[in-house]
Amino acid sequence: MMTTLRALVIAFSMYSQIPMPQFTWQDKEMKYAFCFFPWVGAAIGGITMFWWWFCGKFSVGNVAFAMIGTAIPLAVTGGFHVDGFMDTMDAFHSYQPREKKLEILKDSHIGAFSVICLVLYELIYIGAYSEIDAVRQAGIVAAGFFLSRCLSGIAAMTFPGAKKEGLLYMFTSKAHERAVKTALFLQTAAVAVLMLYLDGVTGVAVLVGAGLTFLYYYKTVSYTHLRAHETLSD
């Protein structure tokens, strides 16, 4: 029981800004931490639903609803994933060989492409957020934070890594693969059922979109990894 609780605390300590008890991380606890990665999304979803209720209760306008709603994930995570997104966009749009892209990922400076892609992403996000006008739609958005982390966790445990170092490698290399994958797949199934219950049509659209995106990146990453392996073998 204590190992499970510590694994939960590690997940929140690593992937959120929510204050957590401090202790020395042990391998036996870290190997289950990824099981609780989606729960960070659950926390974001819970705050999102509270914000939806607050806006309805006190007649907050759509602009404030969308802007602050967009800020909630950033505030909870501390922009952890945004930092990675920006690094990735700089590397991807450099159109350089794989080794050069890995160097760009390590560079702490931001480039023009990362800023452009982030602004584009946030504008689309705010625009979509402003169109939420029903509690069930808000519920699906909230559940989406959980779903995205389920799929992200599955990808981290399944896709070949770009490098054998860094925080992601540290967590995935120490993870109990079978237990983590089982937990993530079960949680994915559970949140999928919830989305379909909230709104069948919207739920199907979200799940299909998420599934296709996952498959696209699976094929892309697997192909890139295969080509890199073939190049090293030549």
Predicted regions and their residues:
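Membrane-proximal soluble regions of multi-pass membrane proteins
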Residues: M2-F23
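Alpha-helical transmembrane segments and their lipid-water interface positions
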Residues: Q17, H81, D90, L118, ...
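C-terminal ends of transmembrane helices
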Residues: P21-F23, I154-K163, L215-Y223
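Multi-pass membrane catalytic core of lipid/isoprenoid biosynthesis enzymes
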Residues: K31-T48, T88-R136, I140-V141, R178-M195
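Membrane-embedded alpha-helical segments that form the functional core of polytopic membrane enzymes
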Residues: F36-M86, I140-A142, T202-Y218
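Solvent-exposed interhelical
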Residues: C150-L184
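Glycine/small-residue-rich hydrophobic helix-like segments
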Residues: A183-Y223
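Conserved small/polar residues in nucleotide/adenosyl-binding loops
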Residues: T224-T231
